[in-house]
Amino acid sequence: IASCLVGSEMCIRDSGKAGAEPEIRVRGTNSINGYKPLYVVDGLFNDNINFLNPQDIESMEILKDPSSLAIFGVRGANGVIIITTKKAKEGQTRVNINGSFGFKAITDKIAMVDADGFKTLYNEQLKNEGNPEFNFTDWTGNTNWQDEIFQTGFITNNNISITGASAKHSFYLGAGYAYEQGNIKKEKYSKVTLNVSNDYKVTDNFKVGFQFNGARMLPADTKSVATALRAAPVAHVFNEEYGLYTTLPGFQKAQMNNPMVDVELKANTTKAENYRASGNVYGEWDFLKHFQFKVVYSMDYSSNSTRKYTPIIKVFDNSVEGKVETLGDGKTGVSQEKQTETKVQSDYLLTYQNTWGEHSLTATAGFTTYYNELELLGAARTQGVGLVIPNNPDKWYV
């Protein structure tokens, strides 16, 4: 969706992580809601649009001048992006199927010094601090950690829509599937979306209808790039003799792990599942020739659940007895969290429209109520004496 906004005089920043929400700035930054704009999807206020399928979007309108404040109050202080999803247009029934796939790669990696350069610079730092040089005898690696964690990503989008309309009735049904492999190894993201709308003209001046958008998302277990930029290149990635990933030098291992420990050994230790359902029902009545009264009741429900597993991780460390070190406290653990959010909105709009020759007038009066409820529950546990928690998602419950 962010690609649709490129060229719209907004700041758009994509982290590159699979399925991550892009950072969109319409009117800079303020102290209320940070930088995020207000999204209005089919009239319903939202703080993100990750659940939408780009193929189901009919139009997008950006408000970034004082009009965003005049209409939406302080909630529009960061700008407003108004999104209208697709509905049927009058005509014969149509079926549309499309699919796409692509690849993404890191084309401009951050330049880092090699092992020899790092040793020289680090010992110069120690010398300036009045400390003895570090003994790099056991640290003979020359590793570019960015090369180790990055991969060529893959993305695919597949969509189908069915639409049809007559003089009195129209419908739209759209379904989509998106899958993405990130640029960091083991990152995977998938999303299934559904969009349904139906409109019915009861009489010549009275119309009713509904709109529904739903999504099921499996977020990626994202990893940080920062460790790969900070880890010393003097460490080898893997020790073949012991069959273990190596630790970092003593001046770093207390602050961070070998980047590949996080990427490989902690891969698939987070299971997340997000559901989103958003929709509305409306009635629209035209009366007295120039007046229209519209009532819209909207609801948005989201449920995000996450389960995390802490495995026992052993690494090769030449500085300890036995050459094998266990990270952390050496205990398995699980944590579980569930967050639900419910938004209910009602809109009552009265519109007057008239035309006199070359002049036209449109006046609107409206009243909106908005209700938001957020619930969050989390818990964690570690293994008992000798009772190791299995590395099996079926057992990752508190």
Language model segments and positions:
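Short acidic/polar hinge/loop motifs at secondary-structure boundaries
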Residues: 42-70
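Short, glycine-/polar-rich solvent-exposed loops and beta-turns at beta-strand/coil boundaries
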Residues: 13-20, 52-55, 72-77, 187-190, ...
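Single conserved hydrophobic/aromatic residue that forms the stacking wall/gate
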Residues: 1-7, 11-12
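Non-catalytic regulatory/gating segments with a bias toward low-complexity or hydrophobic composition
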Residues: 9, 43, 60-61, 81-83
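Short beta-strands and strand-coil junctions in structured, solvent-facing domains, enriched
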Residues: 9, 31-33, 46-48, 66-71, ...
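Surface-exposed loop/interface segments of Gram-negative outer-membrane beta-barrel transport/assembly proteins
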Residues: 17, 89-143, 168, 182-189, ...
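N-terminal periplasmic accessory domains that precede
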Residues: 22-28, 76-99, 158-161
